[in-house]
């Protein structure tokens, strides 16, 4: 099993690489790429950790050497949010970065499972899909926007609010990966009930949690460590699915034939071909149905931005 991390010298990339080095199955290969010259050194640093995961780092303009033979590619390259910026402010820089990297993925490892972390995810996933279509290698079952950070934040905040064991909290988060497009389905959480006020405040907190971190870091960065953990969880689920493990389900932003939008975050069953099955997200409350319907114009606009960028 070979996993490539593109953007491996950044805050998310280094956290993700550390977690993968310690958690990938024995015998795996971990390939780190970043434009920054420090990247081979990050790999050397991680190589001293005593796990049976081989690691190699690559720097420079061309990620191709890092991508050869990759089964899973996780892309965190790009600029991070600063105070006062929203995820769409990142579009101007990150759109081009994702396009260029996906062109190399399409040419080098077209059947790899690709997880996009680079924001704005609502748009960068659409860019990746269009680039792959142009290259004639698009498989909607192999492209994912990683929204797991919204899921782990939901799990954490629910457990804190209700005094639950966080390991027991399961919650689907649907829609997209920014602002109002993030919709945690709190009505489905087992073992917890919420007042209308709690639903409103918790939903808003989950939607704005990224900004909470950006402001707390006071110009020193965005959510890198929690995002690294979220990306590792999702990446390991992709690996487990590829290895044939049963019942691996994660929420992800995918081209899943949703009635709501071309790309939509929802639960998916993972397997040897990436998405084995897009799962229904179940019954929702009136609050959730209204929030879902009201986000769709925003989400569709984000998607169109990505499609138009490539065309």
Swiss-Prot record:
The active site is at residue 177. InterPro entries: L-lactate/malate_DH, Lactate/malate_DH_C, Lactate/malate_DH_N, Lactate_DH/Glyco_Ohase_4_C, Malate_DH_AS, Malate_DH_type1, Malate_DH_type1_bac, NAD(P)-bd_dom_sf. Substrate binds at residues 81, 87, 119, 153. One of its GO terms (molecular function) is L-malate dehydrogenase (NAD+) activity. Homodimer. Belongs to the LDH/MDH superfamily. MDH type 1 family. This is Malate dehydrogenase.
